[in-house]
Amino acid sequence: MNVQAGFVELVVRNLDKIEEVKESFPVTGGIDIIVKVEGPDVETIAKTILAKIHSIEGVSRTETHIVVPL
């Protein structure tokens, strides 16, 4: 996820309030925060990202990757 300059700490604090967010890590490089979201199905995860995470002040972009079992 990318956030606006100066918003990393605020975004992480707000992510911690979301039940489906299991972990969040500020990182360096091309993205600002890596977020682990869990849910019973893809629809729940999508709703969490679109309705809850995208509404956090400072969030400018998300990119979703889904883990698939081998």
Language-model regions: role of each:
Residues 1-70:
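A compositional/biophysical signature of low hydrophobicity enriched in polar/charged and small residues
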